[in-house]
Swiss-Prot record:
Free-text remark on how the cofactor is bound: Binds two Mg(2+) per subunit. The active form of the enzyme binds two Mg(2+) ions in its active site. The first Mg(2+) forms only one salt bridge with the protein.
Biological function: Trims short 3' overhangs of a variety of RNA species, leaving a one or two nucleotide 3' overhang. Responsible for the end-turnover of tRNA: specifically removes the terminal AMP residue from uncharged tRNA (tRNA-C-C-A). Also appears to be involved in tRNA biosynthesis.
Residue ranges of domain Exonuclease in the record: 20-194
Known EC number: 3.1.13.-
Keywords, ordered alphabetically: Exonuclease, Hydrolase, Magnesium, Metal-binding, Nuclease, tRNA processing
UniProt-annotated catalytic positions: 181 (proton donor/acceptor)
Protein's name according to its UniProt entry: Ribonuclease T
Lineage start: Bacteria, Pseudomonadati, Pseudomonadota, Gammaproteobacteria, Alteromonadales
Amino acid sequence: MSDICDANKLKHRFRGYFPVVIDVETAGFNSQTDALLEIAVTLLKMDDEGMLGIDKTLHFHIEPFEGANLEPAALAFNGIDPNNPLRGAVSEKEAFLDIFKAVKKAQKAADCHRCIIVAHNAAFDHGFVSKAIERCDLKRSPFHPFATFDTATLAGLAIGHTVLAKACMMAGIPFDNKEAHSALYDTERTAELFCYIVNRWKQLGGWPLLAAAGAQDAESDTEE
């Protein structure tokens, strides 16, 4: 089968977009004024059967940018002490340079043309990521400037629940509420949930589309 029509390749699954699962922990809800404190990024891969799975995860504690607002209620909620030296925090720029390098390498390996953020309530994470990139004056961001895959929406459709913990449990994905609100933990659970939904849709016959399958069959007949 020609690579052009192989629906089991990641580059054909999302119109050439490479999905990158992201979760952030912050010191508030305003991406312009409130600090980004933690970020985790999970890269995905697709096997020869077209099943999506986790590849690897990057994780960074972030130093608040100069003049950043730190909302006490937000810090109490996520349990982060921005001044704790044991966090091993790095600057936003250092973190995003490493993230850019890793995601661009994975995107290229998958032969995709751009990355797209996957997140639970994705507008929030996308907003903080975009603003941090802007603050750092980083050029050539690998991420689409506005399109995202929101697992809250996808889970509502596919599973019937929009809360991450509930959706994971309903999908058979273990979820420990004591570990929640850690970017590392939440990102990997979000990645598992996204993979579950994508793979389940395939198993139910939703992918590849009949038109695409017909094109593949026609090409196979021509080659024979």
